[in-house]
Amino acid sequence: GVTFASPMEEMDADLLLRQADQAMYQAKLAGKNRYCVFDAEQDRSVRGLHETLEEIRRALLTQQFVLYYQPKVNMRTGAVIGVEALLRWQHPEKGWLLPAAFLPLIEAHPLAVEVGEWVLGNALAQMSQWHAEGLHIAVSVNVGARQLQQRGFVERLAELLAAHPTLAPGDLDLEVMETRALQQLASVSAINMACREIGVSFALDDF
């Protein structure tokens, strides 16, 4: 692993050693008899991603995420036939963030499952509240590829539904995003069937 001391920056020996270690690790990943020069830009990018992941963890713990419900309207009759749950992040410094600003960063990270469960749990809680008020509204929820392919997804979904016994499972529609990231279509087909068996509608969003 190779690194260089920049005359423009104040750098101590410990920092140089850490940078050389990072470069050595990258060289080992590339194969035998390789060397790698420390990339400061890549390092900043990695640290930026790590900081964002920590912010998302904090957002889950401090209720910074919010769901909005967009009506789905029958164009013929004008009647509202359901709503779609839309995730927003009320960031304390950056303001309201759309999913495109943060969800792609966690597609391959376990946080994708945690955020997905938060969305499902809160959507079901809202459905229960509406049901108690006499409103029976079907809700569509987007599910990411990683969450869908997580072991025990259907069992966990059944647990979340069981926590809201007044709801009809058929009022929950799952729309699977990132279908290009689905790795095993046979297992996805089995999940589809299992969801339908417990009464939950299931659709592949861009398949």
Regions found by a protein language model. Give the residues of each.
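Regular, well-ordered alpha-helical segments
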Residues: 22-25, 29, 58, 128-132, ...
